[in-house]
Amino acid sequence: MSRVVVVTTGGTIASVADDRGVLRPARTGAELLGDEGDRGVQVIDMMAKDSSQLTIADWDRIASAISAAVEDGTDGVVITHGTDTLEETALWLELTYDGAAPVVLTGAAKTADAPDADGPTNLRDAVALAGSADAQGLGVLICFGGAVLAPLGTHKGSAGFNGPEVVDRKERPFLGTVSAVAAPRVDVVACYLGADAVALDACVAAGARGVVLEALGAGNAGDLIVEAVQRHCAAGVTVAVSTRVPNGRVAASYGPGRALADAGALVMPRLRPPQARVLLMAALATCSPVGEVVARWG
């Protein structure tokens, strides 16, 4: 029988309505698992947070729990997680974990007290995947709604996740084992009609060593943003260009996008801002060649 460790962090999968109808994480891992808990599954109730309230330090706590489980000989680890930031946690773990035991993140679109709650099915699927010999060596996976997805390029949709499905093997974009808390600050700055450089300048003044632009269209921004990017890139800040458009590639094909690239910004062709930030954090934290990392994995 496979040994699987389930680490709970909260999220919709564990949430129920309180007496005011407000949804809050309240169910334990044992309650979520039901009979499944008697089948070689160990539960670690780490925290009970809405994933919008998770911090960078929580990534280190999750990583430590994974390391301890792997060192203890577990066959796989499941992380229950809120869907708001699951794509960010999954990618950070993917970039910084190189163990053979699979790490599977799952959650739910509906609360634990909903009559048609999807959490129990998602959790059962995730436990089965984590304990499967076929998942050995695949690294970090997202198991949700009957699909198995690679973290890189996955993003939240209205009732689940959109991303590359894992059929057999997948490349693992491991950059190095590092502490999230020790990683350089990387911020996301939104671009919009008439945007100036105030937000970008403020992020750099606050200590950001990297900034992801949530650019317009295929990767465009106004002149004031372009001028600020040129200043900050010249001063050693890494700027990457993503987009606010849900789908499609980013490219320096229009004049403003080319101006950003000429100013020193890196074009993040595939990743949306939340994951672009995570990739930039990991690249800077591991002292990897950022341009090469973005070109290969961005």
What are these regions (language model features)?
Residues 1-298:
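Active-site histidine-anchored catalytic micro-motif
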